[in-house]
Amino acid sequence: MLKIDKDTHRIEGVEFYDSCNRDERPFDAVIDTIIVHCISLPLGEYNNDNIIDLFLNKLDISKHKSFSDLSNLRVSSHLLIKRKGDIVQFVPFNLRAWHAGQSCYNDRENFNDFSIGIELEGTSDSKFTKEQYSSLNEVVVALKSLYANIVNENILGHSDISPGRKQDPGDLFDWSKVK
């Protein structure tokens, strides 16, 4: 069972890379939402350090032609769940990661302010692994135990809060496997 340190707002025992692509949440922000994303760099290629490098502003854009659009991008997520279920944390949960971008859902905007962003290594048109679902569920349980305002109805896809702009986690993401 995962445990989140209440002082550091980090999951104990997981790999942590300190992304500078973050800032303070608004003073009155209440964490009550989880946003599920997916990412792979390059598209459909897994088990490399490109996502980590992107979130740390260290991505070598000469490594792949598709990286040229990412040269000045400053983004992060609180977590990345790799294909084998390994969890990597980039931003403590009490801080605002830069994952949602322009967002609106149910008359709420600026989802970075009150949400936790979780990236699954994958694409919006591929299936995710049982290990990823297992780790995601462990994370959800741990987050709910620390942030009482997170409820199942507030576990959303990036496509829910940015329709027309984002497709992730995609139609093959099995929401019935998320507790």
Regions found by a protein language model. Name each.
Residues M1-E109:
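N-terminal catalytic cores of peptidoglycan-degrading enzymes
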Residues M1-E12, D28, E109-F114, T123-K179:
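Basic/polar, cationic surfaces and motifs that engage anionic cell-wall
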Residues V36, I118, L136:
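Conserved, mostly hydrophobic/aromatic
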Residues C38-I39, L120, S159:
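Residues immediately flanking
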